[in-house]
Amino acid sequence: MKKTLALLLAAVMLLSVLAACSSKAETPAEPEQTTEEPAQTPDAPAEETTEETTAAEEPSQEELDQAAADEVAAMIDAIYVQTRTNETDAQCEAAKAAWDALTDAQKALVEGDEASPDYFGLDTGDASKDDPRNQDDIGENELLVVSFGTSFNDSRVADIKGIEDALQEANPDWSVRRAFTAQIIINHIQARDGEKIDNMTQALDRAVANGVKNLVVQPTHLMHGAEYDEMCEALEQYKDKFESVAIAEPMLGEVGSDATVINADKEAVAKAITAAAVADSGFESVDAAKEAGTAFVFMGHGTAHVAKVTYSQMQAQMQQLGYENVFIGTVEGEPEETSAEAVIEAVKAAGYTNVILRPLMVVAGDHANNDMAGSEDDSWKTMFEAAGFT
């Protein structure tokens, strides 16, 4: 009986303890709710945090400037192409409008795969002095002058337009028209200056639409290179649309099988460019320049095309004419003996101390202004000066 009573008392005590513990554990729950409510009451700190976050998310002026410049760079890259599309006109116009809307600071930030501030910002002369020669009313006889092209306005007016004007004067019964083979140049001129120049397809379509019967194509290309080949391929598609088609030779004539095969065209050009270089530099003759330790270096473009032997032929022609202080080089270094490094070594080995650089190109455009006479470390002028020449 006593044991039973003891067990009952123990059970009652255990239940009391458990109830007390349960009561103590639940009691703080109310204060927890009470303490949380005051923490939510003040609204001011939360608003300040939101304002600070919004301010931090707003782009800086520098970021806005870069974004505007990047947009224009993308538009330039889009028109910096070799093919023309139905969108080209609109793209050129939109890119120029976007450029004009930039501040000077934003224009300086324009950089893309091909884009730079110079695309629109470089002053190359007055484009209004040029004549794109893309007019209709051609007549039955057309003389189509085909050039690679240049975006340098002054050079285009002096060189390409100069050739076209001379041909028109010499052939008054023929209508002289123009075509460029470099769509990249055509797009650049159109976007920057609003001047539209025909590519080969446009020029030939124009001739057909105007009822041209006799077509003579005169390239201003230096030699039978890739551009000349592409021109001939384009003409092949239109031969049956005219009564007669004639294609003239490039300036240096036939390529020849090797460096020893030199034609009359190369001889005439070699004499003409050397005489002009001698006269412009103030010497009485090429021999007088030689006596003064002066060498003339003519820089061509260069090519991986089989026609690259033309440059070797021109060097051989200079030697045959007795022009020992005249050297032929190329921007591309093709063929290898025409690279800047190779020519510098050749001039140095011959003992000359003064060098006069001249372009071996129909147009003194980007290559002549930058690759030859520019101030960059890889320009020929800089490289010759670094080698100790004056």
What do these predicted regions represent?
Residues M1-L9:
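Positively charged n-region of N-terminal signal peptides that target proteins for export
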Residues S16-A20:
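C-terminal motif of bacterial Sec signal peptides marking the signal peptidase cleavage site
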Residues S22-K24:
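Bacterial signal peptide processing site
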Residues E32-A39:
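Short extracytoplasmic/periplasmic juxtamembrane "stem" segments immediately C-terminal to an N-terminal membrane anchor
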Residues A39-M75, S116-E142:
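N-terminal low-complexity, Pro/Thr/Ser-rich intrinsically disordered segments
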Residues E58-T124:
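Beta-rich interaction/scaffold domains
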Residues E62, D118-I356, V362-T390:
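Extended amphipathic ligand-handling, pore-lining, and cofactor/metal-binding catalytic surfaces
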